[in-house]
Amino acid sequence: MFRTLMNAKIHRARVTEANLNYVGSITIDEDILDAVGMVPNEKVQIVNNNNGARFETYIIPGERGSGVFCLNGAAARLVQKDDIIIVISYVLVPEEKLTSHRPKIAIMDEHNRIKELIVQEPAATVL
């Protein structure tokens, strides 16, 4: 049996743009993707801390070092520039690997730079 577990999380990223007329997805700085192990075209869940919206889309790599977090297409209706979001990817893990699975979490600063990189969810996330 497999369980769906969090594989990676980008916590408290700031939306830099919302582009309604682009063909779907979220554009994320490729340096940030590499740091947490997310990949282009990967399905992700987006949580908007400002309005509570939760939705799914897929990743498009953005310019390295840009700090870009741009919601494209219909998803642009669910965010505004400067909203704080969480981006989460999931993975299917077999029962025998459940205790050894370690997700990567990037805690972002107000300029979309990685403030802290954690391997495994902290016991309490109060920021």
From Swiss-Prot:
Top-level taxonomic group: Bacteria
GO CC field: cytosol
Disulfide bonds: none
Matches recorded under SUPFAM superfamilies: ADC-like
Record's keyword annotation contains Manganese: no
Cofactor: how and how many bound: Binds 1 pyruvoyl group covalently per subunit.
Binding site for substrate: 57, 73-75
A molecular function (GO) term: aspartate 1-decarboxylase activity
Keywords, ordered alphabetically: Autocatalytic cleavage, Cytoplasm, Decarboxylase, Lyase, Pantothenate biosynthesis, Pyruvate, Schiff base, Zymogen
Pfam family, one: Asp_decarbox
Cofactor(s) required for function per UniProt: pyruvate
Gene Ontology biological process: alanine biosynthetic process; pantothenate biosynthetic process
Post-translational modification: Is synthesized initially as an inactive proenzyme, which is activated by self-cleavage at a specific serine bond to produce a beta-subunit with a hydroxyl group at its C-terminus and an alpha-subunit with a pyruvoyl group at its N-terminus.
Catalytic activity, reaction form: L-aspartate + H(+) = beta-alanine + CO2
EC number: 4.1.1.11
CDD domains: Asp_decarbox (cd06919)
Residues modified as Pyruvic acid (Ser): 25
Annotated metabolic or biological route of this protein: Cofactor biosynthesis; (R)-pantothenate biosynthesis; beta-alanine from L-aspartate: step 1/1
Location (main, coarse): cytoplasm
Record flagged with keyword Cytoplasm: yes
Listed InterPro entries: Asp_de-COase-like_dom_sf, Asp_decarbox
Assembly description: Heterooctamer of four alpha and four beta subunits.
Function (record text): Catalyzes the pyruvoyl-dependent decarboxylation of aspartate to produce beta-alanine.
UniProt name for this protein: Aspartate 1-decarboxylase
Organism: Anoxybacillus flavithermus (strain DSM 21510 / WK1)
